Amino acid sequence: PKRPDKPIDLKKEFNIQSNMQVKGFTSKTKWVPEIDHAYVFDKATTLSILAGFQYNRRVIIQGYHGTGKSTHIEQVAARLNWPCVRINLDSHISRLDLLGKDAIVLEDEKQVTKFVEGILPWSIQNPVALVFDEYDAGRPDVMFVIQRILEVEGKLTLLDQNTCLLYTSPSPRDQVV
């Protein structure tokens, strides 16, 4: 489904007592992280992440390197059956990786040039949480693209494709930082 369709029992899934109503997905896709049954959730951080999922809010989690910020998001997503993709910004990721690029592909056994969408257009059109990892290490040209997406009603325009992708609210997608 394109929208969360299953009420989640926060006490059962996260061992958290709260009146917050959160929905996840009934079915699991290949993009849903595996559940670590030994994972222990921090209540305040978990509630912030859950609010991001439920109310289409961007969430930033800060802390020292290696303290499990991204893993925390992935474990929340796993229990919601919510697709989640981690994008490491300290690697060689480019604007083209995020937005898309022309590529040579085979169609009817012939090579043709075709625009292949990047991770951002794909994530806007599908219910997926993006985890921008190592945010402080992102290159300026990459961060400029991400900044537009992180705005409350973010807009992504693909000029080469004459396409404008808009967030709608409430949205089946969440961008989690």
Give the location of each predicted region.
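AAA+ P-loop NTPase catalytic core and its hallmark functional loops
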Residues: P1-S169, R173
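N-terminal low-complexity segments that are often proline-rich with Ser/Thr-Pro
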Residues: Q175-V177
